[in-house]
Amino acid sequence: MSRWPEVAAQLDRMVNQWYETPEIKRMLTVPLTPTRLAFRHLHMTFFGNNRRDCWAAVACTAPLDVKRAIWEHEKDELIYDPRMGKAHVTEEDLGNHKESDLIPGARAAVYAWLYCAREKPWLEGLACSHILERRNNDRIVKGGTLTQRLVKRQELELGIQRKDQDIGTQVHLIADVDHSALLDEVFTRYVIDDFAAQQVLRGAEESLAIERCFHGAVATAMAELD
């Protein structure tokens, strides 16, 4: 019998608690300016690029059916998303920037995520990546996701209407139900005992802690600009 329903419920609690941490509150309260927004956008571009690395790394050691689910999951982000008219991260998005341009806290988080994807058991690594999408699912997060809250703040503080904001931000305003369903099927099949359940919970907890470091570092640096 699958343990996934109870594990999923625990992940949902973890995700909502994540929004109450000091680092995420800092990101959600630092005053926005065009300069600060551009700084965050650069770091989120590399965040997206790191997601592509991590999903691929997990696929390397995952069973064949899980590789298929990851491949299906990644087609929009890596190759072409019709909602954006392009992949989620392109060479043009990265431009001449390198990971070494990121602030140290963000660079450390990027390396930590990649370490988890490469070195942890595949199920734990899968949970590391999955939880970052789960915490942006407005069907789970109470009070609006990080993306939704920042979009609203751009409207209020900078007068930038939703339709005029970055297309990648607009795409992530709505939970990707199809992607979630793909991975729900995987977790339902594989989370069948306490050992597997603990792997998923451990991977999710690790990743949420890493993301706190990422956003906390970026928010602190944003506050020092201007």
Task: Identify the role of each PLM range.
Residues 1-226:
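Non-heme di-metal
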